[in-house]
Structures are given as C-alpha cells and as structure tokens.
C-alpha cells in the first residue's frame, strides 16, 4: 500500500515537472547503446526473478542529444512495463536501429479498444492483475516529446506488445 502510494506521488511529481518544461537543461550527447545497456543491466535481476529473459540487440551506434536522467527514466519505464506484463518463461527484446529503438514483450498484447487509449494519464486496460498507476506511458510520451522523439504503441506482429521510440 505505502510503496504504491509513494510510487504514485513520485510519478505525479515527475509528470508535473515535465509538463512545466519547455526546453531541456543539462543536455548531453548520449550514446543510446550505452543508455539501453545500462537500463537492461538495472532491471536484469528483477527480470530473472520473474522468469523473463531480456535480450539487447544493437544494430546501429546512435548518439542523441538529450537529458540523460530523463532518457534513462523513459527506457526504465518501458522495460518495467515489459517485464511486469510478460508471462514467466518469455523474453523481452530491446532493439536499437539507426532511426529508432523498440521494446517488445511476449505478453498477451492489448485489445484494440485499450490500444486506442493506452498512454492516456491514469488509463489502465481492464482486467489487469498487475498494480500500476496508468502514468508510466504518459511519462514516456512526454519525455520523448521533449526530445523531439515519437512513441508508437502497438501489438507486435509476432504477438506481444511493442513500443517504438523514433527520431
């Protein structure tokens, strides 16, 4: 209870700060392969305990200008969701290409109705067993927008859910 409330307050404060930003301070050149590798390492043990394999595929060396902590939060939120909603024994693929990166899970995907609303603040698809506030993807979308990136949420052709962040 207290952990969930604390996480909700943290996410609300993060969104509030992001909403008030018009441009970014402390911008650095960020090698995205390093950023993704660090995020994968951070969640690796949690994923292993959940019985989920995380695979990192680097197909390009891309450097983007951005705020490191915010881009880290963006990737961490995506990985956290992918691990949370994937069944035990499945895999999460993180793939970096020249124009985008994707996070794809082997979960059930989501219904077309839910897909139309996912990423709205506080929206959670019906029938969720996992806890959450419905703010994580809103935070992802806002951070991406501040960095001139686009976020596409979709059911993957191979099954599961896929998030593509492109520039």
Predicted regions, residues:
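Short beta-strand/loop element within the Bergerat-fold HATPase_c
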Residues: 89-100
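Conserved glycine-rich
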Residues: 148-149
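Conserved micro-motifs of the catalytic ATP-binding
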Residues: 20-26, 63-66
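Short conserved segment of the HATPase_c
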Residues: 110-122
């Amino acid at each position: 209870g207290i952990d969930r409330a604390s996480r909700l307050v943290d996410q609300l404060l993060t969104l509030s700060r992001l909403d008030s930003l018009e441009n970014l301070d402390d911008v650095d050149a960020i090698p995205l392969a390093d950023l993704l590798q660090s995020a994968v390492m951070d969640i690796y043990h949690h994923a292993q305990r959940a019985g989920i394999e995380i695979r990192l595929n680097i197909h390009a060396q891309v450097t983007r200008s951005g705020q490191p902590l915010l881009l880290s939060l963006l990737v961490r939120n995506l990985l956290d969701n992918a691990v949370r909603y994937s069944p035990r024994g499945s895999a999460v693929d993180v793939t970096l290409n020249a124009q985008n990166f994707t996070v794809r899970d082997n979960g059930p995907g989501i219904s077309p109705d839910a897909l139309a609303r996912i990423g709205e603040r506080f929206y959670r698809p019906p029938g969720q067993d996992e806890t959450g506030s419905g703010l994580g993807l809103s935070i992802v979308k806002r951070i991406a927008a501040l960095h001139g990136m686009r976020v596409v949420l979709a059911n993957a052709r191979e099954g599961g859910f896929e998030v593509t962040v492109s520039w």
